[in-house]
UniProtKB/Swiss-Prot annotation:
GO cellular component: mitochondrial inner membrane
UniProt name for this protein: Cytochrome c oxidase assembly factor 3 homolog, mitochondrial
Lipid bilayer topology: Single-pass membrane protein
Keyword vocabulary terms for this entry: Membrane, Mitochondrion, Mitochondrion inner membrane, Transmembrane, Transmembrane helix
Stated family: Belongs to the COA3 family.
InterPro entries: Coa3, Coa3_cc
Domain of life (superkingdom): Eukaryota
Membrane spanning residue stretches: 51-73
Length: 96
C-alpha cells in the first residue's frame, strides 16, 4: 500500500517536458499558451498597480514643488515690499 501523499511513479501530471526535444501535440501547445497568458496577465496587473502608485507619487512630488515655488515667490514679494518701506523710512545721505 502506498500512502496518499506520495505520487505514483506512473502519474503523468506535472511532468516536466522540454518542448525543444519532444514533439508537442496541438492541445499541449494550446495549454502552454493559455498558462503563459494567465501568468502574463497576473504579472501585468501587479506591474500596472506599481506604475499607478509610482505615477501618483511622482505627481505628488511635482505638485508639491510647484506649490512651494508659488509660496516662496509670494514671500519674496512681501520681502520686497518690506525692503521698499525700509528705504523710504531711512534718511537719505550723500552715499545713498
Amino acid at each position: 500500500m502506498s500512502s496518499q501523499g506520495e505520487p505514483k511513479p506512473e502519474a503523468q501530471f506535472a511532468k516536466r517536458i522540454d518542448p525543444t526535444k519532444e514533439a508537442l501535440t496541438k492541445e499541449q501547445l494550446q495549454f502552454i499558451r493559455q498558462v503563459e497568458m494567465a501568468q502574463w496577465k497576473k504579472k501585468t496587473d501587479k506591474l500596472r498597480g506599481r506604475n499607478v502608485a509610482t505615477g501618483l507619487a511622482i505627481g505628488a512630488v511635482v505638485l508639491g514643488i510647484y506649490g512651494y515655488t508659488f509660496y516662496s515667490v509670494s514671500q519674496e514679494k512681501i520681502m520686497d515690499e518690506i525692503d521698499e518701506e525700509a528705504k523710504v523710512r531711512v534718511p537719505k545721505t550723500g552715499a545713498n
